[in-house]
Amino acid sequence: MTPATKLPGDVGPIHFVGIGGIGMSGIAEVLLNLGYVVQGSDLKSSRITQRLERLGATIFEGQRAENLEDAEVVVISSAIKPGNAELDEARLRGLPVVRRAEMLAELMRLKSNIAIGGTHGKTTTTTMMAELMVAGGFDPTVVNGGIIHAYGSNARMGQGEWMVVEADESDGTFNRLPATIAVVTNIDPEHMEHWGDFDRLRDGFYEFVSNLPFYGLAVCCTDHAEVQALVGRITDRRVVTYGFNAQADVRAVNLTYKGGVAHFDILLQAEGQKIEGCTLPMPGDHNVSNALSAVAVCRHLGMKREEIRTALAAFGGVNRRFTKVGEVDGVTIIDDYGHHPVEIAAVLKAARQAIGTEGEGRVIAVHQPHRYSRLSNLFDDFCACFNDADVVAIAEVFAAGEDPIEGASRDDLVAGLIRHGHRHARAILNEDDLLRLVREQTRPGDMVVCLGAGTISAWANGLPERLRG
C-alpha cells in the first residue's frame, strides 16, 4: 500500500474509459503521481490527454476492446453505458469495473478531506480552497472539475494531510466520498434525469452532510434558502455558515467593485474578528460568496487573517469561469461554463459589475443551451435569466446525446425571451454567424460573454483571432 491510499501498489494497470474527461483526468493524474500504472482511452487527443501522456500514462485514441489487453482494473464515469466496447470487454473478462467516485473515494481514505458540493460554484470554490490552503502552508492534494490556472491542471499532488475534492452530485455518487469537511454552496433543481424530483436532491445533500464523522464540519451558504433549510435539518454535526446576511458566521460586508475587482471586508462573527481590506481579482457576488467558504474552512484550520487577505488578492482563477480569452478593439471576450439559469444570471451580473455603471459599455450574451431536457424543464427560468444582457444571441441546442423535445429548441427560447420582454434577442446559426454578430453589434467598452457547456467554448476561444483577421 502507498502512504496515501489503501489501494495495493501492485494492483496492475488501471484503465480509464474516457480518460480525457475533466472528472476522470484529475484522478488519473493523482494515481500517476502515486506511482500507479495508468492507461486510458478517449475519442480524440486533447491537451489533457497529452499532459497525462507526458506524466507517464499510456493513451489510446478511440475506444476499442483491444485497448484493455494489459488492464487489470477499469474505471468508468456515469456517462459510460453498456454497449461501450471497453466496458463490455471488461465485463466479459471479469475485470473489476470501478465507478469514478469509488476510485476518488479510495484516494481519499487516508487523508483528511474537504469535499465541495453544491449545484453551482463547485469548481471555482474548490480552486479558491486549494489556493488559500497552499498559501497557508497546508500543501493539499487537489482533484478539481476544472483547470486551475495556477497549476495548469485540474489536479495537484501535495504532501500535506488534506485533500480538496469537487463533489459531483449529478449521479448521486458524491455521497460515497469520505469527507471530513463538507461545503454546500447552493441547492437548485438540476440533474433531474438522475434525481427524479427536487425532494430527492434535497435528501441527497442532507445525506452528503450527514455522512460526516462526528469530528467533521459542515460549511454552508445561508444566503441560499434551500441551504438554510438544510442547516435547519442538521442536528448532530458542527456547522459554520457563510454569506452576506447578518446571521452568517463568516460574512462579507462593504462590497464594492472597481475595474472588475471586488473590494470587501470579512466579519468573523463567532470570533469577534474582522479581515479588512480584502480584494478578489474577479467580479461577481457569487465569487465573493464562494471565497467566503474557503475563508471559513481555512480559518477553522488556523490560517492567519493576513495570509487569507494576501491569498485572496492573488487568486488566479479557473478555466471557463469568467475567463477572459481576448480583447479586440476595446471589446472584451469572456468564456464561461454557465449553462443553468442561476449560473447564467450570476455571470451576467458579474459582467455588468465588471464593465461598471459608468460609460456606455454593454453586455452581449451568447448562449448555447446544453441538453434539451434542461431547457425544457427550466424553460421559464431560461427566459428570465438574461436580464443583465443588452443583447442575447442563442445558438442551437448542444444535445449531449439527447433527442429533441418539442418546445425546447433554439427558436423556442428566442421566442420565449421576446415574450418575457427582452428587447434584443436573436438566433445565431453557427460560429460564422457569431463573428458577424460581434462585428456588427459591438463597440469599444462592450463585453461579449459566451455561455455554455458544449462547443461554444471553442467559438469563444477562436473569436479574438477571427475578429483580427
Curated annotation (Swiss-Prot):
GO terms for biological process: cell division; cell wall organization; peptidoglycan biosynthetic process; regulation of cell shape. GO terms for cellular component: cytoplasm. It catalyses: UDP-N-acetyl-alpha-D-muramate + L-alanine + ATP = UDP-N-acetyl-alpha-D-muramoyl-L-alanine + ADP + phosphate + H(+). It is an enzyme of class 6 (ligase). Keywords: ATP-binding, Cell cycle, Cell division, Cell shape, Cell wall biogenesis/degradation, Cytoplasm, Ligase, Nucleotide-binding, Peptidoglycan synthesis. ATP binds at G118, T119, H120, G121, K122, T123, T124. GO terms for molecular function: ATP binding; UDP-N-acetylmuramate-L-alanine ligase activity. It comes from the Bacteria. It is found in: Cytoplasm. Its EC number is 6.3.2.8. Transmembrane segments: none annotated. Pathway: Cell wall biogenesis; peptidoglycan biosynthesis. Cell wall formation. Belongs to the MurCDEF family. This is UDP-N-acetylmuramate--L-alanine ligase. The lineage of its organism: Bacteria, Pseudomonadati, Pseudomonadota, Alphaproteobacteria, Rhodobacterales.
